[in-house]
């Protein structure tokens, strides 16, 4: 039966599996590829394969891509030729195939498209389709969805276009390539790693600070902020996260806002509609910024503001 996974708007349809068949499923795949890893790496590779074979809660597209890359990095140098990466793009479509081959057999094959993905393990298919769009919180008449693809320079799935559907049958998309190009330029200059370290701190801190502000609790000093932040970080399982009480906005949020603001079609739509304005632009910015953050760091911050608000009320 369909279940919601990943970022909350991916749907998965899969073959039903019993616990016994799932274990057998894992064993078959592991027996096929375990020799691709040296003894010191097999324990870690074993855990990644188990995650791949978890048909009850399959990984989303970004995690699939991450797992494939991790398995490649763990493999013995002499076996890396068994890992195949094929990326195709033209004016009409683009797709990425990630495969592990063993002679004529293909024990693992991952196919990633712009709006859906699926993967096969030992010729058993798990199909996951991006079928659900999201609604803006304040503007329920606007449906939004990010179309993603594999960005090789950044080594992640990256949002390529923002698709919007409005009441009255109006549909259009916003090109997000300027965001990607900005980050690729950093990578080419060798600045991306240092920037990402600061960006993650800013992204987490700014949303925690926003949640504290929206809670409307008075007399919160930096010590209380730090206490709230520590609890929120623990509850949301953000590994090795740091908090800065003075951060108000992340660089990604600024880059996304600039990209959307420069889109004439989007801005004309906002200006012509009496019910939409800069608040709508801010919500669109936050949606895209969350997708970009998830792409870069493989973590979902969408609940961070609400979690912080609840914790701030609890601490007051």
From Swiss-Prot:
UniProt family annotation: Belongs to the Sif family.
Subcellular localization, as worded in the UniProt entry: Secreted; Host cytoplasm
Record protein name field: Secreted effector protein SifB
Organism: Salmonella typhimurium (strain LT2 / SGSC1412 / ATCC 700720)
Keyword Secreted: yes
Family annotation (Pfam families): Sif
Factors inducing expression: Induced when grown intracellularly and in an acidic environment; repressed by H-NS and induced by SsrB.
Function according to Swiss-Prot or TrEMBL: Effector proteins function to alter host cell physiology and promote bacterial survival in host tissues.
GO cellular component: extracellular region; host cell cytoplasm
Keywords, alphabetical: Host cytoplasm, Secreted, Virulence
Keyword Secreted: yes
Alphabetized InterPro entries for the sequence: Sif (IPR010637)
Gene3D superfamilies in UniProt: 1.10.4120.20, Secreted effector protein SifA (3.30.2440.10)
């Amino acid at each position: 039966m369909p279940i919601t996974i990943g970022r909350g708007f991916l749907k998965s349809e899969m073959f039903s599996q019993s616990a016994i068949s799932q274990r057998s499923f894992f064993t078959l795949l592991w027996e096929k590829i375990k020799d691709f890893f040296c003894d010191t790496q097999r324990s870690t590779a074993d855990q990644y394969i188990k995650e791949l074979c978890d048909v009850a809660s399959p990984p989303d597209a970004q995690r699939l891509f991450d797992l494939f890359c991790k398995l490649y990095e763990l493999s013995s140098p002499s076996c890396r030729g068994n890992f195949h990466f094929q990326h195709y793009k033209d004016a009409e479509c683009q797709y990425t195939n990630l495969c592990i081959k063993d002679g004529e057999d293909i024990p693992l094959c991952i196919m990633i498209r712009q709006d859906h993905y699926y993967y096969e393990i030992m010729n058993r298919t798990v199909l996951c389709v991006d079928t659900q769009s999201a609604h803006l919180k304040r503007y329920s008449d606007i449906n939004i969805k990010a179309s993603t693809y594999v960005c090789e320079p950044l080594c992640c799935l990256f949002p390529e276009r923002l698709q919007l559907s409005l009441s009255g049958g109006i549909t259009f998309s916003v090109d997000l390539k300027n965001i990607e190009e900005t980050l690729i330029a950093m990578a080419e200059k060798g600045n991306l790693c240092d920037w990402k370290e600061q960006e993650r701190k800013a992204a987490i801190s700014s949303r925690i600070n926003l949640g504290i502000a929206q809670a409307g609790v008075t007399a919160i000093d930096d010590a209380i902020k730090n206490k709230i932040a520590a609890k929120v970080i623990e509850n949301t399982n953000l590994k090795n996260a740091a908090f800065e009480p003075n951060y108000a906005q992340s660089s990604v949020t600024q880059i996304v806002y600039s990209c959307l603001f420069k889109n004439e079609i989007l801005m004309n739509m906002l200006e012509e509609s009496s019910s939409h304005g800069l608040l709508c632009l801010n919500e669109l910015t936050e949606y895209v910024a969350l997708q970009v953050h998830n792409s870069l760091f493989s973590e979902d911050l969408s609940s961070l503001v609400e979690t912080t608000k609840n914790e701030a009320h609890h601490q007051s």
